[in-house]
Amino acid sequence: MSEFMKSLCKIAIPVTLQSMLQASFSIVDQVMIGQLGETNISAVGLCGNFSLIFSVVIGAVSTVAGILIAQFIGADDSKEAWTGLDVSFICGLIISAVFLLASGLFPAQILGLYTKDVNIIKAGAVYFRIIAFSYVPIAVSTILSAWLRCKEYAMIPFLASFGAVAVNTGLNYLLIFGKFGFPCMGIKGAAIATLISQLFNLAFIMVGFIVCIRKDGDKMMLSLHFEKITLRDYLVMITPILVSEFLWSLGQNVESAVYGHLGTSNLAAYTLTCPIQGLIVGALSGLSAAAGVMVGKRLGRKEYDGAYTESKNIMYAGLIGAVTVSALLILLSGIYTGLYRVDYSVKELGKILLIVFALYAPVKVENMILGGGIIRSGGNTKIIMIIDIVGTWCIGIPLCLLAAYVFEWGIVGVYTLLTTEEIFRLIVSLVIFRKRKWMISLS
């Protein structure tokens, strides 16, 4: 096996498995809560929409941490790599504290932005107040995972996720349905299970992080001062990612609000497809993570031709994988929607939405690899910010509103039209990739 394939598999496979586990984490929640009816499914889905904003913002911090750590490890500069981790860690704690306060104190007001259904808001507020406390452990574990992946210890976050899913599944069964003497808590039980599983995930990653540091003979450094770059450079790098990811997630929330106003059945149909969409994207997300680390290390060593060649090979692998998985999803979509105890019409809408998603999946995956891994690895994050803003707010959102309120289409038509913005992203990203101006060494 070539060195390229060894490095790719060492990073991509654990990250892929971890992403799939995290997506299955959502599927377990959805299927179990789905037994409680459409109101609870919708409530959890809307809470997830707000949590998505947190996830992408903290993911932006983790992305910058990964860019810096990968490049400086490639350049054999341990001190700068630790500084990248420490600064990102502080940013993550501040952001998670803000989201904790917002979702813990104002759950009903936040949910009211998505739906006017009082029952959904009431159920969602109970769920929201509990999962708000999971934001801090999620932030810490996400940033520590960036370090572990760059050091090619991606198996540790995967094992942590595996354990967390097992904990979540077991506690869901006990607390949602009141088995083995536990109280029957419904949606509240699902929230408690989620919180405990995230605490388990954090504990596992922290132990693994300490073990790996000792194994490598590294010394933990607390440093908030860069030497190769300035703090201003860090802010210039992270700000476009924060802006683009926040606006993208806000756009997702606007789209969800539109879905919510299409009616409870349409919202339920879309919500039940979200976990499987996350599972499919997660199945190929390892390639994006591997691209960021592998290409970043090449750039850190100023091996520009090697970085370009590796980027193309990863993109080819992503295309083949996406087409294969999409074909399987089209064949199995009906089986998945059949797992839910909802009306037949909701199942059929969900099945059609999954087929539409499968047709767009290869484009989505290539965008994920290019925008989320390759182009960002050079540190010039402004390019992706512009693509994201134009794609979401100048194309996706207007098409969504046009389809829903002018054409008055249903959920399938609205979703199909707005997803065409992925094609714009891919065309522009490919043009930028071929020009090679994104290939910058920070060392």
Predicted regions and their residues:
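Residue-level hotspots within pore-lining transmembrane alpha-helices
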Residues: 17, 21, 25, 54-58, ...
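Helix-terminus/linker motif at the lipid-water interface of multi-pass membrane proteins
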Residues: 20, 24-42, 111-118, 174-185, ...
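N-terminal transmembrane alpha-helices
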Residues: 3-31, 35-36, 52-68, 93-100, ...
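Short alpha-helical transmembrane segments in multi-pass integral membrane proteins
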Residues: 1-15, 69-136, 182-239, 295-360, ...
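Short runs within selected transmembrane alpha-helices of multi-pass transporters and secretion channels
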Residues: 62, 131-150, 157-168, 190-206, ...
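Transmembrane helical elements of multi-pass membrane transporters/channels
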Residues: 10-29, 130, 164, 197-201, ...
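Transmembrane alpha-helix boundary and packing residues in multipass membrane permease domains
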Residues: 15, 19, 30-31, 48, ...
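Small-residue-rich hydrophobic transmembrane alpha-helices
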Residues: 41-101, 138-157, 267-333, 365-389
